[in-house]
Design a protein with these regions (language model features):
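NAD(P)+-binding Rossmann beta1-loop-alpha1 motif at the extreme N-terminus of oxidoreductases
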Residues: 1-57, 61
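Interdomain hinge/lid region at the active-site interface
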Residues: 203-273
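Residues at the starts of beta-strands that form the adenosine-phosphate
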Residues: 5, 30, 115, 142, ...
Length: 280
C-alpha cells in the first residue's frame, strides 16, 4: 500500500510515532493530524510542519488511510464522528491493546462505510503523549493485525504493507487469541511491575540498580490508560494472574522446603525461555 493521504486521529505516543514514521516512509503522502484539543496544535505543527492539523472531523475526507489512535473508551464516539467523511475504499485501523471489545464495537459501525481491520503495535513507552513520539518506534517491533472472517484479503494485505513500511514485523491472529496472548505478554507484566513496586516500597529505592529499574519501568505508565486496559480485558487478565499466582506458589514452595533441585529447575526453565527471546 502506498497511501497518498494519511489521517491520524488523537496523535499521542503511538499516533504521533505513526505520523513521524509515515512522513519518512511515504514522503509524497499528505499527513493529516486530528486533535480534540486546539492547544496541542502548536507542538504538533512544530514537529510536523508540512502536516495538515485541526480539530474538525471533516479533515479525514479524501483519506485512503485512517488511524484511530485514541484510548479504547474514546474509539466509538470518535468513529461515529468520522463516519460521514469516510469512503468505502478507505482503510481504517486502530492501535488499541484490546481487540475483542474494540472489534465488537467498531466493526458494525464501519460495515459498508470503510475497510476496517484492528491493529496493535507492540511498541511503546512508560512516557505518554506526543512529546514521547519517535519516528523509529516501530522498527523491528511486532504489530498484530486481527482480521475476522469478514475481513477482505485486500484489507489485510494493505494493512500489512503499511505497517511493514514503518519497519514493523506483522503478525495476524483473531481478536480473541490476541487478547489472551497480550494478557500474558503485556498486561500481566504491568500488573507484576506494579505489585513489585508496591511490595518493595520506597525504603530500599536508594539501592535500586538496573535489575529493579528494568523490571519495574512499565509501572510508571499512565494509570488512567492502564486501568482502562486491564478492566476491558479483565477476563483474560484474571486468568493470567491466577496462572502467575501458581508460578509464585511453586517458587515459594521450593524455597520454603529448601528444595535446591526443584528451585534450580524452576530457574533454569525460566532462563531457557527468556534466552529464546534474545534469539527470536
Amino acid at each position: 500500500m502506498t497511501p497518498s493521504r494519511i489521517t491520524i486521529l488523537a496523535p499521542g505516543l503511538i499516533g504521533g510515532s505513526v505520523a513521524l514514521a509515515a512522513t519518512r516512509a511515504f514522503p509524497k503522502a499528505k499527513i493529516i493530524l486530528w486533535t480534540r484539543r486546539s492547544e496541542s496544535i502548536p507542538a504538533l505543527r512544530s514537529a510536523l510542519p508540512k502536516a495538515e492539523i485541526g480539530t474538525e472531523p471533516s479533515l479525514i475526507a479524501g483519506s485512503d488511510l485512517v488511524i484511530l489512535a485514541a484510548p479504547p473508551s474514546a474509539l466509538v464516539p470518535l468513529a461515529q464522528n468520522i463516519l460521514p467523511h469516510l469512503a468505502p475504499a478507505t482503510l481504517v485501523t486502530d492501535v488499541s491493546s484490546i481487540k475483542g471489545s474494540v472489534e465488537k464495537s467498531l466493526a458494525p459501525l464501519f460495515q459498508k462505510k470503510a475497510r476496517w481491520i484492528g491493529s496493535h503495535p507492540m511498541a511503546g513507552s512508560e512516557i505518554s503523549g506526543f512529546a514521547a513520539a519517535r519516528h523509529d518506534l516501530f522498527q523491528n517491533a511486532p504489530v498484530i493485525l486481527t482480521p475476522t472472517p469478514t475481513t477482505s484479503s485486500d484489507t489485510l494485505q494493505d494493512a500489512t504493507s503499511f505497517w511493514k513500511s514503518l519497519g514493523a514485523h506483522v503478525l495476524t491472529m483473531s481478536p480473541t487469541e490476541h487478547d489472551t496472548q497480550v494478557a500474558q505478554i503485556s498486561h500481566l507484566p504491568h500488573c507484576v511491575a506494579t505489585a513489585l513496586v508496591l511490595t518493595a516500597g520506597t525504603r530500599a529505592l536508594p539501592l535500586a540498580g538496573s535489575g529493579y529499574r528494568d523490571t519495574t519501568r512499565i509501572a510508571a505508565g499512565p494509570a488512567e490508560l492502564w486501568s482502562e486496559i486491564l478492566l476491558e480485558n479483565r477476563s483474560d487478565v484474571l486468568t493470567t494472574l491466577k496462572e502467575f499466582q501458581g508460578s509464585i506458589t511453586r517458587l515459594a514452595h521450593a524455597i520454603e522446603q529448601k528444595d535446591a533441585a526443584s528451585l534450580k529447575n524452576i530457574l533454569q526453565e525460566a532462563a531457557q525461555i527468556r534466552r529464546s527471546l534474545s534469539h527470536s
